[in-house]
Amino acid sequence: MKEKKLNILSVDCDWIQNLKSQQDLISFVIPLLFKDSQIILNYDNHKIYPYFLHGYDEYNLWNIDHHHDYAYDQYLKLDEGNWIYHLSNVFLKKINYVWINNPESVHPTHFNRQKINDKLKSYKFDPCLSFISQQTFDKIFICCSPEPEYNTHLGITTYKIIERIMNDKPTS
C-alpha cells in the first residue's frame, strides 16, 4: 500500500537578511504561487499548526526560516518559536523536517537536538534554497513575522509583495 504523504513548504520572511536573499526568495517563491498548491498567508508562523491534518503516514516539511522553530526557551507554549516541537509531539516520528537556514542562524542546542532525534523522523538543514528539490507542495504557508526583533524591512516588504500578488491573482 502506498504511503500517504503531505508536502508542506513553510516560508518565514524573516529568512531575508539582505537584498540578495530577498531576490533569491522572491525568485524561488513567485513561480510556486501559480501552481496547484493551497497557499496560506499569515503574519504569525505558528498559525501553520492547524494546516497539518491527521490521516497521513508521513509529513514532509521544508521550512525556509532564519530560526529553527523547534524549541526555544518557552517550548511548552505553542508560539512562533516552538510550533515544530508541538507538531512533533502530535505526529511522532512522522515528520521529515528540512530547515533552510541562514549562515547566521543559531542551530538547536544539544538538549533540543536530542528532542529532535527522539520525535522527528528526519532532520536536515542547509543554507541554500537549491537544497529544496521538491517543486510541488500540497500546502505553502508564507508568514511575515513582523516583530522588529525577528524581521527586517526587507522581509516585511517581501511578505507584502507576495500578499499583493496573491490578492491580485485571478481565481479560477
Provide a role label for each language-model segment.
Residues 2-172:
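Conserved alpha-helical scaffold segments that buttress catalytic/binding sites
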